[in-house]
Structure formats: structure tokens, C-alpha cells
Amino acid sequence: MKDLLKFLKAQTKTEEFDAIKIALASPDMIRSWSFGEVKKPETINYRTFKPERDGLFCARIFGPVKDYECLCGKYKRLKHRGVICEKCGVEVTQTKVRRERMGHIELACPTAHIWFLKSLPSRIGLLLDMPLRDIERVLYFESYVVIEGGMTNLERNQILTEEQYLDALEEFGDEFDAKMGAEAIQALLRNMDLEQECEQLREELNETNSETKRKKLTKRIKLLEAFVQSGNKPEWMILTVLPVLPPDLRPLVPLDGGRFATSDLNDLYRRVINRNNRLKRLLDLAAPDIIVRNEKRMLQEAVDALLDNGRRGRAITGSNKRPLKSLADMIKGKQGRFRQNLLGKRVDYSGRSVITVGPYLRLHQCGLPKKMALELFKPFIYGKLELRGLATTIKAAKKMVEREEAVVWDILDEVIREHPVLLNRAPTLHRLGIQAFEPVLIEGKAIQLHPLVCAAYNADFDGDQMAVHVPLTLEAQLEARALMMSTNNILSPANGEPIIVPSQDVVLGLYYMTRDSVNAKGEGMVLTGPKEAERIYRAGLASLHARVKVRITEYEKDDNGEFVAKTSLKDTTVGRAILWMIVPKGLPFSIVNQALGKKAISKMLNTCYRILGLKPTVIFADQTMYTGFAYAARSGASVGIDDMVIPEKKYEIISEAEAEVAEIQEQFQSGLVTAGERYNKVIDIWAAANDRVSKAMMDNLQTETVINRDGQEEQQVSFNSIYMMADSGARGSAAQIRQLAGMRGLMAKPDGSIIETPITANFREGLNVLQYFISTHGARKGLADTALKTANSGYLTRRLVDVAQDLVVTEDDCGTLEGITMTPVIEGGDVKEPLRDRVLGRVTAEDVLKPGTADILVPRNTLLHEHWCDLLEANSVDSVKVRSVVSCDTDFGVCAHCYGRDLARGHLINKGEAIGVIAAQSIGEPGTQLTMRTFHIGGAASRAAAESSIQVKNKGSIKLSNAKSVVNSSGKLVITSRNTELKLIDEFGRTKESYKVPYGAVMAKGDGEQVAGGETVANWDPHTMPVITEVSGFIRFTDMIDGQTITRQTDELTGLSSLVVLDSAERTAGGKDLRPALKIVDAQGNDVLIPGTDMPAQYFLPGKAIVQLEDGVQISSGDTLARIPQESGGTKDITGGLPRVADLFEARRPKEPAILAEISGIISFGKETKGKRRLVITPVDGSEPYEEMIPKWRQLNVFEGERVERGDVVSDGPEAPHDILRLRGVHAVTRYIVNEVQDVYRLQGVKINDKHIEVIVRQMLRKATIESAGSSDFLEGEQVEYSRVKIANRELEANGKVGATFSRDLLGITKASLATESFISAASFQETTRVLTEAAVAGKRDELRGLKENVIVGRLIPAGTGYAYHQDRMRRRAAGELPAAPQVSVEEASANLAELLNAGLGGSDND
């Protein structure tokens, strides 16, 4: 019996390991794995079906074909276990050893491993410092390579052609050694002295200055060091022994009809063995060189094909012209080992069916068809039946269940009670795509789903299917109940708002119920309470919408958390009073005393969750749903054609628009406007007409005229069904109603340009043939878009998950003082996102002070929940520094304080939460709602882009930041700085609006002045950029020579003449080096200095500048000296939607990025070249100036002599994130990426918390480049994991040594995934071959820190419930408690078991 227990223990024993290492296998190692050499290409005997001896399926090498039976049948049964049959040489053991025993092939000549040869950069090439072409020519027997030059003038590694080799032979005889083929390369690799080579290269590195050479040397040093440290020998990259896969992993299966289905590997192995044997024979016969050579080349090709078919030359194909699947193909790609079998497995105990509505279910229930339940819970039912003694054996139980006896159903009821099941709907885009429910048995064959969880699943009932999974073990059931139950997932992890929100019918019902109506039946009653309201409604004495007074009792929490009752008479309606009955204690009545739309209901549930917690919210949500359904039914809302009321004004508006269009057409024909202008104007006219029609239509639908109690007419909100559906947010929108009852409007062609004849009809009137045809473009494009979008969005999610999968909360507080400063998001005159939404659920990084005082309002390290946010708002705090994931100091993972609130739970996040995956899902899940479009700016949009003034919307005071200005002659301020921002501050000191003010803008109001709403505060000319003088004096032209550097132009319309500076390309030879400038002198002709500097005021003029002043004119500060025409941006496309998000996360450089100042200093221009100007920035402190060549066509934002700060924009354009990181630091680039991504999502109305984007940014900033190594082991210019540098520097500094200096790198998500420390994770993502090659050469260890690696090796993941398990393992490992594995091999134990069983089954005589 003891043996039996030992056996069961041995069965469950897992290999205890902490890391996985990959390395090159030496020939001896391969031989040690092998159980024998495969000598023949034969597989099995076609008559006896027995494996051939020494063949690819040989039983002697790989083990017996039948359990405990040798091949010839001499030894059978268990008692001969371990015997090796002397006749056939087969060991008597279990047949499963054929899955693990390997063989080998001794190659007759060495062969290069194609991965190390062809996987770029070629490892062999890098190690020998030879081009890949040369190595290939040697390997495939086209050239010789010199192995030892001896005393001759031939160098090592030199390539010789056939002729050169023969000449050298004649000349030097056998003083030198040159060979061809893999043996030559092997010899070269064997002769390398790695350590000495390393020393030599390091010396070279210190001496060289050329950038390219340094890069190349660093690469080689890294590779050489990897070889030295890992203990790999270079010559192992050349195979002399080839391992053979165990036969059961490349099976040969007989089909009916005497044919065989075989794995492609067998074909490839056969090829290798055939060629190898032929080569051996040729060598024995001492065949001519050329024949042997050809055979060797063929062997090399066969081995290449086996390892990675198609990597070099044409892929070898099988009988059906299909390329054979090699070993490399087995592991890579979607169908490879990693993604098909290790990361995605099939699930036992699951079923799927169509879903249908379960409106009577509670939130934690789902309806499960009896048939399904019986099948899924079979094992539990069998167990219960046996336990009760109703069935003696499992077989009997099975029969009972098949007969579906009555008792079985009773037992099924018991088994199912409180046993949660998981429901999953594909595609599972975020974690709410799998939730747990308690099953309720139902008749029929469809699964019933609770309507409120549809939003999380994105499910509807038009034929969607869902899968049911049964958690079997107790732990699984516990996790399902505690973590995955639908009632525990009320808030969305993406934004912390309720996701269990009523929609459609329910919203309509609640909206209808809470609307009020003028002069409804029963208006003006005074009722004793909600109960009475319900009674009089049921009795038909009052309408649901009647305005009445009701006595309402509200409960408020006092400071001790006790409920205090407060009764008062409220003006409300009958419906709202009835709804109040289901609202839980503790919420104010005002929450239902309004017409409830979708937003209001969501807010109501949110408030309920925050004040009362989970349980009341769940009950409340269910109650709202039942009530909503009931009253939606009573409302009788329907859609009829007469509900789509077409406004009378429509035809008038359209005829006006047609007249305008005709007028423009006339202007065009008489040549007053260009074709482009005409097109844009026409589009504008129709867009405006469309807006007017839809406004008229909405006004018409929105209100109806009724007679009130006094007999007067009164306007009230309409009860039109279509309008109610749109207004409540149940279904439809103003835009859709516009198409039904207004006009369809402008349509786009397939290429995205707008057709200038709009569809003036709507769907109620019906479309004519042409209009219908035009409409088809959009419809078809919509379908094509959706299909593309799904794939793209899925791929984005996959990359995001891959880059962030190993980010887990690993400690409570890292203690950092860093953080990011949060301000409200303000675009122009609107607050897009208030501060409260941005800081809610974050932890403060420093004390927040009361504005204008030194009092602490919120102490450091406080989690800002709703109450704190109210406090911040009450004190009108404008910016808060909060902790952020990006600045978290934890080495592996992040700390809870830097992350803040767990959005889906509402408290500080727990340790072990997989925030990386949550972030990836939150960003990826709404991906399918984003557009795929590139927006063309045309028509209305392009003219709105050229703004020329700032008009404020609210009243308040003006605040200018980083502004330099001068006062002009009329006493107005003129801005002379580049990135000036104008903010409007309200009386509480909060920022309400924010605008960019360009250079040269004239301010109507100064800093700190009060303005009223609607006032214009700044003006400028959008088409030219002025040059503004900061001093007063007289103009003096320098180098302004007519015909050489300038030319005079006269305007035909005004007759004014002006000077235009010639571009250097247009100048004569004499004018090339002249630099036209305007100098300002005083009355005596002395230079005037720019205030605050010792520089004379002179303004250099770039090409095309227009000067409207004459030499010697008097000017005063703030005047415009010259104007530089701005080419308007034209119609640039803005990339929007998904492609934009992908670009941001991939950190792609934009096409023509903005040029930023690399250092702070004074601008000047050096000598120009043909197409470029030389920009020089001279630092004020007198250090080295910085020079940059800028193409002429780039428009510069700076003038000579102007001062710029590091990171300022020198030339406009989209900013490249890498530049922002380099010049302005980590926080700036985080802010840039977060804001840009949020802009895209905000446009679609999707809310995502900033945290999630920051998490991804942290992963993009994972690497750092070493700038100087200090006392560390890093190489200069090497890219290393940021955490590794941090740890190394910490250790060095602790020992008083100099740490390494480094700069952070920004990698795109794909590159960041591939550059992860874990090679298992990287290999399962993309470019499997390259990743594994690199890892093997470097002898990498995978510490199994991330989630993916642990899934692949089949362990619990180090997150969630697995986090505790891993922590415990590490603790016990450290304490040395983990026991050594039991010393019983599985075979032995299983044999013992079998013996015991035999003994028990009458096998022994002495009982």
C-alpha cells in the first residue's frame, strides 16, 4: 500500500524549477540524450507493420510499441519489466517512452545550423567578422577559406576562389591550410580565442571615434561576451550530430486502404539519412572530390530543410506540391506550438448554445437548459448517486442518468445549488467577457442571460451564442464566486463607472415613468406617500405623469454612519413617487425627481455604489430593471410613420440653399472664384442647410403645444415615441432622426471625398434611384470598414497585452517622491475633462495646499476618493501632483500607491493584481468602436482652421504664461514669445479656458485684466508671420541691395509698393553671401541694444519676407518691421481613430516632425548649403554651440538673435515622441502620449482612465541606453532593461563606486514586447526564430516573472490568486523548506501499482 501512495505522489510531482535556460547543445550532450543511432531511412515494414530495426521508428532505440511487450513477443507482461530481450534488443517497458526517448544521426561531415547562419544578423558571420555571402559560398562549396595562413601572405578568414586556391597551392605548397564546407567554418570557430578577441575589441573601441565602427564593435563584443559567459562554444553552431525527435511526436498513422498518413518530419529525416548514408559510402570508396562535394552540399541542404524549411532557397515540397513543415514551423505562427497549444488550450466540461433574454432572473443567475446541465454536471451526479447508494457502480449510475430517471433530476437540483458556472461570449475583449453565474434550470434549449450584463458581454439576442464552463475544483468554484460573479463586477475596469447599466427598454420605461405632463389627470393632488401614489395610479384616478405633491421620507447618513430620517412635502409626479419605493435608504430624493435618461440612471447607480456599497446596488439594479420593463410595457411606446414629423420649413431652406449654389456657379463661370473654392463653398452651403433642417425638425419634434389647467396654451416636452427614445438614450440619436425626418445630407465617395449634391430626401419621403445609388457607397464602405477594423483592433490588443503582460502590483509603496502634475483638460473654450475626473482614485505625491495659503488641504500619500475630490473642488484647486505608474520606483512590477484605486472595486489596488493586462484590455476593447478613417480636411473645416482671434466664452480674468511682450505705439500689448498660453481664470481661481497665442498677436487686454464673456482678447493675421521690433529708433537697411537681395513689388489693387527679400536660390552670385537685415539705430546713428542684453537690435530677414517700410523711417517698439508669408498647411490629412492609436503606441516618427531646439541658447544662422540652412544655437554660458542643418522648405518659427529653451519648437509639425523624451523628459512624453490617445477615444465618446495608458507608456520606457559605463559591467551604447541599470547603480553606489549614466529609450509596443527579458514570452509573440536564436547564443535564463511565461510552462500565474502561491514558494525556498522530490521514478511507481493491482485481482495464491 505504501508503494501505491508513493506512486500517486510521484504522478503529481512537478519538476521544481525557478528559471528556464536555453543554450546551444554540444555534440556530446546530444549523444547523451540519445538512446541509439538511427542508421536507416526505413520507417515500418509494410507487411507486418512492425518498425524496421535501426530505422526511424526502431523499437530498440525508442522503446516498445505495446505496453510491457518486446517486439518479437518473447517477453510479455509486467514481471519482465526492465528486461532487454536478447533476440530483438527491445526493453520491456511502457510504450509512452516512445514520446520521450530521442535518437541521433552521426553526420558524415559537419553541417551548419541554419538558424545561426541565416537568422539576421548572422551569428556565425558576426563572430568570424565575415560577410554572410562569403560564409555561404564556403558552406555551399563555391570558395575556399584560409584557416591557417602559416608563413605565407594569406590571412586567416580570407576567401579564395578555386583558381586562387590552385595558384596558392602551386606557390606555397602545404604551408597554408584552406578548406571549404562546414568543416572549414567549424575549424575557424574552434580556433577562436574568445577572451583574447574581447580584450582586443575593447581596446579598439576605446581608440576609435567613428560612430558606425563603434556600433559594429559593440555588437561583436556583446556576442563574444555572451559566448564567454554562457559557456557555449562557437563550434557548436556547426552540427556534427543531429538529434532525432521521439517517434510518437512525429507519428505514422495507417489509414484505411493500406495508405499511411505521416508527419512531414519523417520525410525530412529520411532525406537527411539517405544523403548521409550515401555520403558515408562515397567517402569509403574515396570518390572524386567533386562528387563528394556535391553530396556534402546536398546533406547541408537536407539538414537546413529539416531545421527550417524555406529559410534558404526554395522550400522542399512533398508529393502534393506543399512545402514540408519543418521543426521551426512547428513552433512559430498562430498554428505553432506556442500559440496553438501552450497559450490556448481546449476546455473540458463546456457546452455552447444560443442565448435569449431572462428578464425575470436575478443579477447573479443565468438560465441553464436542463439537457445541458445534466451533461455538464455528470461527474457530480454520478458521485451523488453512488454516495446515496442509489447506484452501486459508476456504470449503473451512468445507466440511470441515460434513462433520465426522476431521482436524477432531484440530484441535479442539489448538485447545481450554489455551484457557479462561467459564461463566456466570443470575442472575449476584456475580462468581463467571462463572468460567473448561479445556474437556474430551465426547459428549452437556449441559455437565458440577465439583460443587465449584456453591455459587459456586448451581447444581443439576434442569434448570439455563448459557452458555459463548469469550474470543477473547490478552488475554482471559490474564485468564480468571489472574483468572477456578475454581482462583483458592477464597475468597468476601464473607467470605474458602472457597467451594469440599464439600456434600451428599461431606460425607456424609467424615462416614461419619470416624465411630467401639463394638465394630466390628477394634477395638483396632495398625497401622503409613494404607497398612496401607486394606489391612485392603479385605480386610474391619476396619470403617471401628473404633477402632484407627495410626502417623502429621505434617509441621510450622519457622521457616525447612522441613517437619519427627514420627511418633507415634495413637488413631483406620480411616476417618480412610485419609483422612489425601490430606491434604497440613504439616497436623496432629488436623484429620481427628474426625467431619468440613460446618463442620469448610470449616475444614480454610481452614487448608490459609492454611498451604500455593493449589495444594495445589486438589488437596486435588479429592481430598476424589473420596474423599467413593466412601465415600458405600459407606456405602449411604438414607432409609426407619423412619428417622423417633417418640418414645414424644410422645403424653404432647401430652395434657399439651391439658389445660393446657383449663384456661386455663376460666379465660377464668370471666373470670380476657382473650382476649388466653388466646391468648398457648395459643400459649406449644404452642410449649413442640413444643420438648419435638422434644427427645425428637432424643434418641431421636441415640443408640443398643450392647454394647461387655466385654459392657456403652453409648450411642453413632446411625448413623440421616436423623440422619447432618442432623448432618454434608449435607442437612436438626433443624427438618425435627422435621416428619418430631415434630410440625409451630404454623402462621401468611396475615396472619402464629399459628393457636392446632397441627398435632400429623407427615409420617410423615400429616395429616388440616384440618391439610393449614392447611399450605397457609404453602406458598403461601412461593412468593409467593420471587417478590417475588427482585425486591426484585435491585433492592437494582442500587441498591448504582450507588452504589458508582466506588469503586476508587487509592493505596497515604493516611497518615491516623483509624480505627474494633473490639470484639467481644456481645449479652447471648453473644459473637456475636469480635474476631478483626472485625479479621482489617484494618490497625492505631495501635500496639496489651499490656494493662496500655506495650509495643507490634502496630505501626501492620500488616496483621493469622491469626498477628497469634493474638497478640492470646493477650494478650487487647479493642479494636483499625483503618483503615477510611470514614475514608480519598484524594480519589477509597480507599487499600489503609484497605481491608486482599483477601478473595478473602488479601493486601493491589491498586491498581485495584473494591471498590465487590465490596461491592455481597457485600451483594446473599445478599439472596434474607433474609426479607421483618415480625415481629409476640406470645406468648412479648412477655413475654420485659420483662426485669427481669441474670443473668450466666460467672464473672468486673463492670465498669460511664458509670455514676452512689448507695448506698441497705440498702447496695446504685442506678444513676442513663441509658446504663449492664455488662460481664463474664474473668480475661484480655476482655469476655465486655455488658448495658444501666436507670435505677433495684438492683445486687447493685458495680463490680469478682467474680461466679460464673448469679448475678443487677441487678434492676429493668420496668413503671415510678423517680425516685431522690441525697441524704438530709426530703420537702417543693411545688405538690402535692389536686384541682388531684394526686389520691389507694387500691388495692383492698392498701388502700394513693398520690398520683397529674394530667396538665396533666386539671388545673383554677388548676393549669395549677403544677409539682408533691418538694423535699428538712434538719432545719432548708433546701434540700439535689445533691452536686457548687450546685443544690437538688428533683425535678419529670411527669403520671401515683405518689408513695407523705407530706409531711415522712425519706428516705435511693437511695430511690425516685415511680414513673412505663411504657406497655409493646405489640406493635410489627419490620421484619426485606430491607426492613430497604433501609431502612438508604436512610437512611430511622423513624416515631417517638428524640429525642437536641442539646447537652450541664442539662435543664429550659419553658412547655407544648396538645399539647407544651418541653424546655430549658442548657449548663454559659453559652452559648445549646437549646429543643425534644416531643409529650406521647412518654415522656421524663430529669428536670428532670439533666445530659445531646450525642447522649444523651432519649426512646426507633429512632434516626435522620441524628441519629446530626449529634450523634455519622461513626464512630458507621458503627458503627450496620454493626451493624444485620449483625444482619439474622447472623439468617439469612450472613457478610459489615464492610468491604463500610463501603464503602457511605462512598458514602452522599459529600456535605457548606457551613455557611460562608470564602474559597471555595461557597454557604452548598449541597450539594457531600465530596472537592471537601476539595481546595478544602487549596488555600485552602496559600495561607493561610480554608477553608469544612461538615457531612457522609448520603444514601440512591438519592439518592447520583443525586447523583453523573457525569451519565452518574446518567442511566443512574433519572430520566434530570431528570438530563440538570440537567446540560445547568449545562453539566456528566463526567470519566469511574467504571466505568459508561466502559462507556457504550465504553472499558476504570478498574479491574482497565483501571486500568493508564488510568494509562498519563494519564501519557503529562501527558508530552505522545500523538500527534495521523492526518489521514485514514475515508471517504477506505475509498475509497483500494476503489480499491486495484479496481486489484488487474484494474482497471488497465499491469501
Curated annotation (Swiss-Prot):
GO cellular component: DNA-directed RNA polymerase complex
Superkingdom, natural source: Bacteria
Signal peptide span: none
Enzyme Commission numbers on file: 2.7.7.6
MF terms (GO), sorted A to Z: DNA binding; DNA-directed RNA polymerase activity; magnesium ion binding; zinc ion binding
Pfam families, per database record: RNA_pol_Rpb1_1 (PF04997), RNA_pol_Rpb1_2 (PF00623), RNA_pol_Rpb1_3 (PF04983), RNA_pol_Rpb1_4 (PF05000), RNA_pol_Rpb1_5 (PF04998)
Record key words, sorted: DNA-directed RNA polymerase, Magnesium, Metal-binding, Nucleotidyltransferase, Transcription, Transferase, Zinc
GO BP terms: DNA-templated transcription
Binding site residues for Zn(2+) 2: 814, 888, 895, 898
Cofactor requirement: Mg(2+); Zn(2+)
SMART domains: RPOLA_N
Residues the entry annotates as binding Mg(2+): 460, 462, 464
Binding site for Zn(2+) 1: 70, 72, 85, 88
Co-factor: note: Binds 1 Mg(2+) ion per subunit.
Similarity section: Belongs to the RNA polymerase beta' chain family.
Subunit structure: The RNAP catalytic core consists of 2 alpha, 1 beta, 1 beta' and 1 omega subunit. When a sigma factor is associated with the core the holoenzyme is formed, which can initiate transcription.
Record-given protein name: DNA-directed RNA polymerase subunit beta'
Taxonomy of the source species: Bacteria, Pseudomonadati, Pseudomonadota, Gammaproteobacteria, Enterobacterales
